[in-house]
Amino acid sequence: MEITLSISSSSVIPTRLPNSSCYSNLSFLSSNSNTSSLLLKKARIKTRTTKGFTCNAFFGLGVPELVVIAGVAALVFGPKKLPEVGRSIGQTVKSFQQAAKEFETELKKEPNPTEEISVASEQEKQEIKVSSTKDNV
């Protein structure tokens, strides 16, 4: 796809043109001394295809890294103690998640409107008492 655009010498040529999703490289060719002729050629970029299975779901670690970590843990703790260690780590993570949820709900929780109403009603009662004592004097 080729587009020819003529621009007078006094106008400004944009330094960057918007890219579309499938065409992103633009080639600029200029010619003619009186009028700048801009020829835009859009080049199609080849997308890379990744081979193999990649999973970056656990702290940005891939499958091979997780396998190595599991193997080292099995060697360090042994097959008998490994389930106990896994359970304790799971319980710790669960308690941290529960604490985070509780903290989040406390932050999101609005103050009770009944407390505000009771404070306002007490102030009104005090104002009424003050105005009634002024009337009596």
From Swiss-Prot:
Subcellular localization: Plastid, Chloroplast thylakoid membrane
Alphabetical GO biological process terms: protein import into chloroplast thylakoid membrane; protein transport by the Tat complex
Transmembrane regions listed in the UniProt entry: 57-77
Stromal side: 78-137
Location, primary (coarse class): plastid
Stretches of the chain found on the membrane's Lumenal side: 55-56
Keywords, sorted A to Z: Chloroplast, Membrane, Plastid, Protein transport, Thylakoid, Transit peptide, Translocation, Transmembrane, Transmembrane helix, Transport
Gene Ontology cellular-component terms listed: chloroplast thylakoid membrane; TAT protein transport complex; thylakoid membrane
Annotated transit peptide: 1-54
Location of the region described as Disordered in the Swiss-Prot/TrEMBL record: 104-137
Membrane topology of the entry: Single-pass membrane protein
Effect of G60C: Loss of protein translocation
InterPro entries referenced in this protein's UniProt entry, alphabetically: TatA/B/E (IPR003369), TatA/E (IPR006312)
GO molecular function, one term: proton motive force dependent protein transmembrane transporter activity
Transport as UniProt keyword: yes
PANTHER family noted in UniProt: SEC-INDEPENDENT PROTEIN TRANSLOCASE PROTEIN TATA, CHLOROPLASTIC
Assembly with partners or alone: In thylakoid membranes, TATC and TATB form a large receptor complex, containing about eight TATC-TATB pairs, which binds the precursor protein. Twin arginine signal peptide promotes pH-triggered docking of TATA oligomers to TATC-TATB receptor complex, inducing a conformational switch of TATA that results in activation of the translocase. TATA dissociates from TATC-TATB upon completion of translocation.
Biological function: Part of the twin-arginine translocation (Tat) system that transports large folded proteins containing a characteristic twin-arginine motif in their signal peptide across the thylakoid membrane. Involved in delta pH-dependent protein transport required for chloroplast development, especially thylakoid membrane formation. TATC and TATB mediate precursor recognition, whereas TATA facilitates translocation.
Family in the record: Belongs to the TatA/E family.
Identification of the protein by name: Sec-independent protein translocase protein TATA, chloroplastic
Organism of derivation: Pisum sativum
Gene: TATA
